[in-house]
Amino acid sequence: MSKTRHLFGTDGIRGLANQDPMTVEIAQKLGQAAGLRFTRGVHRHRVLLGKDTRLSGYMIECALVSGFLSAGMDVTLVGPMPTPAIAMLTRSLRADLGVMISASHNPFGDNGIKLFGPDGFKLSDETEAEIEELMRSDLAGRLAAPDRIGRASRLNDAAGRYIENAKASFPRGRRLDGLRIVIDCANGAAYRVAPTALWELGAEVIRIGCEPDGININEQCGSTKPESLCEAVVAHGAHIGIALDGDADRVLIADEKGRLIDGDQILALIARSWGRQGRLNSAQIVATVMSNMGLARCLEGLGLELVRTAVGDRYVVERMRELGANLGGEQSGHMVLSDFATTGDGLVAALQVLAVLVEEGRPASEVCRMFTPFPQMLRNVRFTGKSPLHAPSVQDARRRAEAELGTAGRLLLRESGTEPLVRVMAEAEDPALVERIVAEMCEAIDSAQVVA
């Protein structure tokens, strides 16, 4: 019988800091349980631990460290560092486990914990369930003897290691001389490494969202609030703008006119570039159910096939591994380039876009506009208690909407994996139809809550 997860969601454990499940007590117990799960044999075991710039990161970090040490694991601390850097360093240092303390694009009051195996990939649902089962048990008799308690140390060159790894994804012999780039690091984990990597490659770098104070992460900046980036690109006469999120596993682009370029366009651009160079391992490009139908048509024109998964970069990665594909991503900006990373890496993806810009010598507004997207609308409906998604009235409304859209459009209803929200998305060539269907579905979901 398979074990079930209660704490872990689609991207680790996440919640409001100092409230269940993001408490000191749970973080410490998680450290103990994960430490025991990944301690095999009598040799010293090590966990690599990083975080973003949230104030609560100090608290969660200390709790996790105490848990891991009590389980007999040595802890290597790297401080604020992008999520993909933690995955990369876990592999590079031959650590038994990697941990990232971050709530990604969420507000500063939230925090989260993501776990990576020794191969740098996020843990499977089954392994997370095993850790939860250990957390629910009495671990007192299984913790380390006094002479086997772990030690904590700090890795001082973590930033430099990640910067060099990211730069290695940029074509050898090419530079960014003459390019003026605005980089928005969301006051998050990449505030030092991303601007430095671009500068070392020769770009003129204009920084915004690079002054974290513990509470301003993702605040009116970064990939979830790209308006400041778009304005800065125009104001500074920049060639391109790059927006990362709080843990730098997402990226969005602004062209020289200050217009936003989403993950679907970025994915199509990299697919075309890599396809021309013979660098694609597969004719299948992996994206999620949120990706625009225009992306599918664009890839078809390139002789490629779009394969869809559930939302979440972990599911994109899993499908890529099954297919042997080396390129996948999400409309939200998660770009997985498995030649260079085991998870979404915003900086590495941005460097692929910049490589095309340098190669073609054309403006970003021309290079990055790969297709005209279908009109698409996404709305979130917050709920309390039980999800209204499976209510008969909602299902009836869904069937009517899908019949009306036919094969010329799509309707997607899904529950968020991190918040009590139902996401309603529709797309079709007729924008008025899209707007009406989304409005009707949102009304049906709201009405179902009232009835319940």
Curated annotation (Swiss-Prot):
EC number: 5.4.2.10
Known cofactor(s): Mg(2+)
Active-site positions on this chain: 104 (phosphoserine intermediate)
Keyword Magnesium: yes
Modified residues (Phosphoserine): 104
Any one Gene Ontology molecular-function term assigned to this protein's record: phosphoglucosamine mutase activity
Cofactor binding summary note: Binds 1 Mg(2+) ion per subunit.
GO cellular component, one term: cytosol
Top-level taxon of the source organism: Bacteria
GO biological process, one term: UDP-N-acetylglucosamine biosynthetic process
Reactions this protein catalyses: alpha-D-glucosamine 1-phosphate = D-glucosamine 6-phosphate
Pfam family, one: PGM_PMM_IV
Binding locations of Mg(2+): 104, 245, 247, 249
PTM text: Activated by phosphorylation.
InterPro entries (UniProt xref): A-D-PHexomutase_a/b/a-I, A-D-PHexomutase_a/b/a-I/II/III, A-D-PHexomutase_a/b/a-II, A-D-PHexomutase_a/b/a-III, A-D-PHexomutase_C, A-D-PHexomutase_C_sf, A-D-PHexomutase_CS, Alpha-D-phosphohexomutase_SF
Keywords: Isomerase, Magnesium, Metal-binding, Phosphoprotein
Task performed by this protein: Catalyzes the conversion of glucosamine-6-phosphate to glucosamine-1-phosphate.
Stated family: Belongs to the phosphohexose mutase family.
Name recorded for this polypeptide: Phosphoglucosamine mutase
Source organism of the structure: Gluconacetobacter diazotrophicus (strain ATCC 49037 / DSM 5601 / CCUG 37298 / CIP 103539 / LMG 7603 / PAl5)
GN (gene name): glmM
